[in-house]
Amino acid sequence: MAAMSLLHRASVSAVAALSGRRLGTRLGFGGFLTRDFPKTVAPVRHSGDHGKRLFIIKPSGFYDKRFLKLLRFYILLTGIPVAIGITLINVFIGEAELAEIPEGYVPEHWEYFKHPISRWIARTFFDGPEKNYERTMAILQIEAEKAELRLKELEVRRLMRARGDGPWFHYPTIDKELIDHSPKATPDN
């Protein structure tokens, strides 16, 4: 790069010297060697006098910047309305206050939460503790019945072996004399 810029500068100054000679000189190259070189026509630029800049190959940051911009956009797209909604709920509805339960009234499971958003989440997405308790008790009952049936099956197998009354005595075995072991001429013989 530097050699090309020096060559370019020398050629420009040579052309300027040859084309701009005076009329008084009759020889072809008369004033070329005696005259000063003109000022540089195309200056070499080295980017702020810090030497020659190198072209550093680095990965593109386009996709990273695009991802971060989209991430910021979608976080703000959902974050701003959520923040506004929570603020409005806290200002206009507020937290629940502890009060005496009336006689004969059974509160729902979501009524024990203080904040209205927690109450809505508990009412909409979660089951009540009674339902969870009944579900767990049903699972425990099914597993207990399975364990009891496994124990009964082991006891039945032990008694069948001890008494010799299993299904293996109900089928007569084939007499070995009926099997033909002679060489066959065809597969169907």
UniProtKB/Swiss-Prot annotation:
Residues 1-46 form a transit peptide. It is found in: Mitochondrion inner membrane. Keywords: Electron transport, Membrane, Mitochondrion, Mitochondrion inner membrane, Respiratory chain, Transit peptide, Transmembrane, Transmembrane helix, Transport. Its main location: mitochondrion. The keyword Calcium does not apply. The keyword Secreted does not apply. It is a single-pass membrane protein. InterPro entries: NADH_UbQ_OxRdtase_B5_su. GO terms for cellular component: mitochondrial inner membrane; mitochondrion; nucleoplasm; respiratory chain complex I. The chain crosses the membrane at residues 73-93. Complex I is composed of 45 different subunits. Accessory subunit of the mitochondrial membrane respiratory chain NADH dehydrogenase (Complex I), that is believed not to be involved in catalysis. Complex I functions in the transfer of electrons from NADH to the respiratory chain. The immediate electron acceptor for the enzyme is believed to be ubiquinone. Belongs to the complex I NDUFB5 subunit family. This is NADH dehydrogenase [ubiquinone] 1 beta subcomplex subunit 5, mitochondrial. The lineage of its organism: Eukaryota, Metazoa, Chordata, Craniata, Vertebrata.
